[in-house]
Amino acid sequence: MAAAGASASGLILSRPVTFVTGNAKKLEEVRYILGQSIPFNSLKLDLPELQGEPEDISKEKARLAAIQVNGPVLVEDTCLCFNALKGLPGPYIKWFLQKIGHEGLNNLLMAYEDKSAYALCAFSFALGPDAEPVTFLGKTPGKIVPPRGPNDFGWDPIFQPDGYEQTYAEMPKEEKNKISHRYKALALVKSHFAKAGYVFQTDSPI
């Protein structure tokens, strides 16, 4: 592990966590949700595009990132799962979105009455290159709708969470960040850090 040692109270000391992302919007949300609870830096890494279940993909990315960073890392994998399609596009939503766009994603469900879906977020944390990653899942149910709202963050315009009349894209940021799949997963991350008693050096985040 990349832990530097232990304090008198037995707390683990380490470098700040490196959150691996090249997505500015995602980074903005993570900073908003975590606040000052977990000091972290951000870094874009070229990690291989993996296939499999969301939790397995997230864990393997954390292992690979921890080796490159040689320290504690947090990685995220996000899915949009259509119930009528048995969970697809799932972890491949990024590529579906790039190829067919919001309209194409709606068209995938044209022949189905069931427009229900869920947003799934898998965060994996590895304390270092020799540590087994721990994974935290957040899930928000909703439905797929024709795109509404700003078109500047992935599939947000076509996902309307249950109990709301707005899509993710239409919601105020502070509202979305209280109910999103990302918020739910990060709440578990924060709880894990608090219970584990990690104490990290507080370098200024970048």
Swiss-Prot record:
It catalyses: ITP + H2O = IMP + diphosphate + H(+); dITP + H2O = dIMP + diphosphate + H(+); XTP + H2O = XMP + diphosphate + H(+). InterPro entries: ITPase, ITPase-like_fam, RdgB/HAM1. Keywords: Cytoplasm, Hydrolase, Magnesium, Manganese, Metal-binding, Nucleotide metabolism, Nucleotide-binding. SUPFAM superfamilies: ITPase-like. It is found in: Cytoplasm. Binds 1 divalent metal cation per subunit; can use either Mg(2+) or Mn(2+). It is an enzyme of class 3 (hydrolase). Its cofactor is Mg(2+); Mn(2+). Homodimer. Belongs to the HAM1 NTPase family. This is Inosine triphosphate pyrophosphatase.
